[in-house]
């Protein structure tokens, strides 16, 4: 038994310059852990509450001093003396202190930072890496990275309504090789954008945010050369993959998308592509069935292996239809649909509404609940994709978590911005530590699909 001796929280800044919570934990025998809470821009309605101060005179209302105070004055006194190695008890005490379904009293940002810092302090005291502390001898699988190289939607001021276009090096033989392929493809994409005199500025997650002015003529919807911005982005990725010297497809690099469709879904139950409308001055909206057909068309025409939030979080019936249509050949990932909540994941499993769950720690708010979400997902034969948020820090916990539970996939941004690269560098360290025991599944990570 190793008792928690001290807990201290403070307000720090994330990758967007927005306040977040950092927590440090010390144990009686010298263990130390530090964790920082991430923050999302595109959020699901059922996510645990990210507690903000609301004082417009300070950080435009986004300060987190309330959450910090809750940790230091309410949570810390109750956890002092508790065994740091007993994660379930630590998390249960905090859940009981909060007493609400979505952690609206104390704030998930503070609770999560404490939960992760305690786990890190326990690993530190045992003098083992976090992934080994959580996963034991079975923790050896390096995840296939899902790298966001073109940003749209809420993550960038670009011409694209869909939020993320990602590359997945499924044909690589190791994680380090996969990362090299990804870096080279990212640089090839930058070169292509420069050649078209497009923008090479990056969005929140380090991907490019192009305007595609070279691809259309003004005031004409059909001027995207008969293609939508999503198709133009996909064409660019295929070209960049080839330019980098790799094959688009199962033997090389495949493509993943996060549509973040809840952001497009309005009260008329249609998906409105506002960025297309802004460019063309013409309305473009799709019904659920039309959206499914559109996504099916993209899958037929491009080497796409994963689609996240292809429909709105309230469109459960649509998700079931989408999964029936293309779920045998494409990973259908629920993010806003499930919000890493076992209650909603179970509902999704029963409805066959997806075949994969995105795992975002701050959506649920404790390590124990996150592990429950991963376990439930994997037992159903679905994949679990561990994910960052658009607002990040140098914290690398999710890298260890992905390896600890052999999730096989991780989504943590592009090949730029140190807050994203930190996670990849941590995975390189883990691969080096595991040495010959390290496993990289590549395409086999998609065990939920028919090969």
UniProtKB/Swiss-Prot annotation:
Binds a second Mg(2+) ion via substrate during catalysis. It comes from the Bacteria. The active site is at 205 (proton donor), 360 (proton acceptor). It is an enzyme of class 4 (lyase). GO terms for molecular function: magnesium ion binding; phosphopyruvate hydratase activity. It catalyses: (2R)-2-phosphoglycerate = phosphoenolpyruvate + H2O. It is found in: Cytoplasm; Secreted; Cell surface. GO terms for cellular component: cell surface; extracellular region; phosphopyruvate hydratase complex. GO terms for biological process: glycolytic process. Its main location: cytoplasm. Keywords: Cytoplasm, Glycolysis, Lyase, Magnesium, Metal-binding, Secreted. Its EC number is 4.2.1.11. Mg(2+) binds at residues 258, 308, 335. Pathway: Carbohydrate degradation; glycolysis; pyruvate from D-glyceraldehyde 3-phosphate: step 4/5. Catalyzes the reversible conversion of 2-phosphoglycerate (2-PG) into phosphoenolpyruvate (PEP). It is essential for the degradation of carbohydrates via glycolysis. This is Enolase. It comes from Mycoplasma mycoides subsp. mycoides SC (strain CCUG 32753 / NCTC 10114 / PG1). The gene is eno.
